[in-house]
């Protein structure tokens, strides 16, 4: 179970642990998991090439997403804290080892008994909108700096664009406990408009195939099952 301990020191430690495990698992996923170790030198060289790229994108997209949930919830008078899930950390790392990622290291837990549907929806949409903001900033940087496609700068910026809009889309899927289910429960028009913009941007700037969309939906359903088993 996710523990109820509101020490700020504990919260910082747990979000750092979750971020590090997610970075490691995502990097392993991009390497194809442990299957890539068949060529050790190439695996290690590529791993350390990818690590800073993944660290920037994941840290901005994941940590800021969770913190925004916390800050908006606290604005409405709730108690909110990020908490890791030990089982979630293990699943995140293990799936990364096998070359696909179920990233569920933890979440911002909100403790309140008086949230309206609107407040819950606004708290929930704050995370994906943060991802959208990161996407917009880094897209502007890409257009402004125009780095060579073969450069490390291009890799850093383009991956952050990719992961930020990807996380926005995943979290807006209408599957409990993902943000999208709460936004949809609050306001269908807001949900449809937000999801439509994210969906179009994702296809325009990431080139994600339909098969990957289907896979993300499958992962969301697995996440939902895992969440229900925790409750």
Which functions belong to the PLM regions below?
Residues 1-231:
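Hydrophobic transmembrane alpha-helices and their immediate loop junctions
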